[in-house]
Regions:
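Extracytoplasmic
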Residues: 5-223
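C-terminal catalytic histidine-bearing segment of alpha/beta-hydrolase fold enzymes
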Residues: 1-3
């Protein structure tokens, strides 16, 4: 069961934070949309440019997904942000044995969806967003977590939620131990945040347990 936390009233414009922030919205040869839009789906793997200590903090400098689990072979997905510390992989379909289209998951994610993985407590990453209209927003998280745990969200450097409980996606029926990291689920309405119109920076913190794969946060206007 996921925990829904009450909106905190923030000065979400926080011009002091934004004026000093050195990160920039993610763009590359295939993604040129700049700041991710809210309402809409925020992709965790498109965290900001800026590097360690600015756009993210990771426990080590090695990307254990791009160029690691997914060998460097010149392809966009296998080498995505390969030189950065945030560990990234992507969903894989139609393989034997099945990986991210397996029968033990609660929802099936899109194929070739990039996600942040190998998470550990204390890690965080920033995503610059462009909010269409000021107001209260609810977020649904697409994720896996073989042990459960907690995350939290900041808006422009200020805490916007308390600890958000991530339910375990462990399924004892799966005979393949490594596939416990590929049981996808959605945490509906895991968080509510109050956002001002225009640019803001969201920070996703890994608080406890880790071993989560974080793919997307889908934001919609709260009812």
């Amino acid at each position: 069961m996921t925990a829904l936390f009450t909106i905190r009233a923030l000065d979400a414009s926080n011009t002091d934070f934004l004026s000093h922030y050195k990160g920039t919205p993610y763009e590359d040869s295939q993604y040129r949309r700049g700041a991710q839009k809210i309402p809409g789906v925020v992709r965790c793997a498109y965290y900001d440019h800026g590097g360690e200590g600015v756009a993210y903090h990771d426990a080590d400098a090695k990307n254990h997904g791009s160029g690691g689990l997914n060998p460097a072979n010149g392809t966009y997905l296998n080498e995505f942000r390969m030189g950065e510390g945030v560990d990234i992989s992507y969903t894989k379909f139609k393989l034997d044995p099945q990986i991210d289209d397996n029968p033990f998951e609660q929802v099936q994610p899109p194929a070739n969806l990039l996600y942040v993985g190998w998470t550990e407590p204390g890690e965080w990453f920033n995503v610059t967003v462009d909010v269409a209209q000021a107001g209260d927003y609810t977020a649904d998280l697409l994720y896996t977590s073989n042990r459960g745990g907690t995350i939290s969200l900041d808006v422009n450097g200020e805490a916007a939620t308390g600890p958000l409980t991530i339910a375990s996606t462990f399924n004892a029926s799966d005979p393949l131990a490594w596939r416990q990291w590929h049981h996808w689920s959605i945490a509906p309405g895991i968080a509510k945040v109050r956002l001002q119109a225009g640019k803001s920076v969201l920070t996703v913190h890994i608080l406890t347990e880790g071993n989560m794969n974080l793919a997307t946060l889908a934001f919609r206007r709260a009812k």
